[in-house]
Amino acid sequence: MYRPKDHGWVEVIVGPMYSGKSEELIRRIRRAKIAKQKIQVFKPEIDNRYSKEDVVSHMGEKEQAVAIKNSREILKYFEEDTEVIAIDEVQFFDDEIVEIVNKIAESGRRVICAGLDMDFRGKPFGPIPELMAIAEFVDKIQAICVVCGNPATRTQRLINGKPAFYDDPVVLIGAMESYEARCRKCHVVPQKKEV
């Protein structure tokens, strides 16, 4: 894939849970390190499933990160000689993240964002649609549906082993005890509002 050398850009990695988004983000961070680029990694403070200080994939791969409360804190921690900014679980940030990512890219940096493109209801998640719109590069990766084995593009939330209702809170931090990857056909949302 062509990468501009004379200006910044935005990369967005999206997909359902268990598709390897954080793993891909970590891979890109490690490649930037091999290229001897200065990198800063951020994650939302709310994501403390595996670690408070690291971006961690479900496979156990990890990279050190700064956990922040809101997107504006990225600017507080931003170091002028940084060449690459990586942000995991970007869907949990406020809408201002789009403006901040754009500002950093316009200053000549590479910005890599990873996150869920849809919430458990199958609806666009937080600032992700806007980030995808401004990005130069978007990778939508799939998981495997745990029900039928087909490619999965959705995240199924489970509460006591049953699909969560449409009106349940959108944000619930969890892992395998609360979520599964599902395909369109096997994704179930009780009481979903029909068009």
From Swiss-Prot:
Record: residues binding Zn(2+): C145, C148, C183, C186
Key words, A-Z: ATP-binding, Cytoplasm, DNA synthesis, Kinase, Metal-binding, Nucleotide-binding, Transferase, Zinc
Binding site for ATP: 15-23, 57-58, 88-91
The protein's Enzyme Commission number: 2.7.1.21
InterPro entries: P-loop_NTPase, Thymidine_kinase, Thymidine_kinase_CS
Assigned GO CC terms: cytosol
Locations listed in the record: Cytoplasm
Pfam families, A to Z: TK
GO terms of molecular function: ATP binding; thymidine kinase activity; zinc ion binding
Any one of the GO BP annotations: thymidine metabolic process
Gene3D superfamilies from the UniProt entry: 3.30.60.20, P-loop containing nucleotide triphosphate hydrolases
Active site: E89
N-terminal signal peptide: none
Binding-site residues, substrate: F120, Y179
Record's catalysed reaction(s): thymidine + ATP = dTMP + ADP + H(+)
UniProt-listed HAMAP family: Thymidine_kinase (MF_00124)
Entry's family note: Belongs to the thymidine kinase family.
Name of the molecule in the record: Thymidine kinase
Gene source species: Clostridium acetobutylicum (strain ATCC 824 / DSM 792 / JCM 1419 / IAM 19013 / LMG 5710 / NBRC 13948 / NRRL B-527 / VKM B-1787 / 2291 / W)
Primary gene name: tdk
